Amino acid sequence: MAVNAGVRVIATTRNRDRFSKLEKLGAERCEIERRDLSKHIAEAKKIDAVLDLVGNSVMLDSLAMLRRGGRSCLAGWLGGLDPIPDFNPLLQMASGVYLTFFGSFVFGTPGFPLSDVPLQQIAADAVAGRLDVKPARIFKFDEIREAHRAMEANQAGGKMVVVHH
């Protein structure tokens, strides 16, 4: 979706084998996810926005990549929910950067009505082939244990769907 909106994307993943898939989806380039990525990329301090799906374990590093006026949205907790020890925004965030968070549990609430989500455009992009919405794996309901095993072993390779008939 970001690429369709004209955004230049640097994707991160824990698995180098996923680079080609991410590049096919439009990522300009890929990096191996690490806690100190900001120290290893040329764009550090020049990035407009970070969508942080890893969470608290890399949040400070995500903030360190941003330019003045840049925004980081914490929207996932793949790295766990452990709090950031002694987090002090005055000392650990650059002046002029923004941190926000989004939890999908707010969809449909008065603060985030579903009518604000461009579902028709997302569906149109999927139908036109501009957005790949195919799940990586589909499981029957009686295969739910295998789905959990794959997810916990980091073998999902994308979104998984469990079908109940």
Residue ranges and their predicted role:
Residues 1-35:
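Mid-domain Rossmann-like dinucleotide-binding core that forms the NAD(H)/NADP(H) cofactor-binding site
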Residues 19, 38, 59-60:
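Short, well-ordered alpha-helical microsegments
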